[in-house]
Amino acid sequence: MADPGTMLYITADELEERFGSKKTEKLARESEYAFLQKVTDIAYEAAWNREIKAVFISGPTSSGKTTTSTRLGSAIHLYGRPTLTISLDDYYKEGDYDYDEDGRPDMESITTLDIDLMVTQFRQLLRGEEVILPRFDFGTRTRSFPEERRASIAQNAVMIVEGLHGLSDEVIGELPQDECMGVFLCPWASLVGDRTLLRPEQIRQLRRISRDHSHRQTGALATLDYWPI
């Protein structure tokens, strides 16, 4: 059953009360604990349902999908089932971008992904077959199939797939439904004062600026141009 969660509203006064060298650290620990508890609950559900062979993690850009998939994989492994983590980002098509009506490169549409290759490899993995997973280079927009990316999943293993379109009909909808579990996540909090000061999408935007700079060779202005406030 889907659990949509509840929007968390934090006032500027409440946040200010929790600032300080010791208070801020405590707030971070409490937030991390709540996050890990939710991940552990999902891991328990996936690990003890032996029909589940794949968990698909989806959500809007910069929601924490990669971090969550890593933590979830570790938690499932602790319950005795090995995992294989796959990022849909490695299935981008090679070559130039498509552009939207404003002339900005489109990296959000599902048409930018090689769905045929993706679904074919996922089906093979769920059948216990071996594949060579792709690796996409965002700097050169090229895709390779290095030998060290050869992979398979054991009979009791769980495949963890993270990406923007992981829960789309074109992806998870093409796979055996009784073997797949879906997880949708998104920062779901607002900072409020006399008015809303920081919305969930702005939190994600700050995360994306940091990620694009570190992992996609993209500056902050380019990110803001692509994803304006």
Task: Name each model-derived stretch.
Residues 84-87, 93-144, 158:
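Conserved nucleotide-sensing/catalytic segment adjacent to the nucleotide-binding pocket
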Residues 1-44:
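Charged, amphipathic alpha-helical linker segments immediately N-terminal to NTP-binding catalytic cores
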Residues 74-84:
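Post-Walker A helix-loop "phosphate-sensing" segment adjacent to the P-loop in P-loop NTPases
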Residues 62:
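Walker A (P-loop) phosphate-binding loop of P-loop NTPases
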Residues 155, 161-213, 229:
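ATP-dependent NMP and nucleoside kinases share a basic, alpha-helical "lid"
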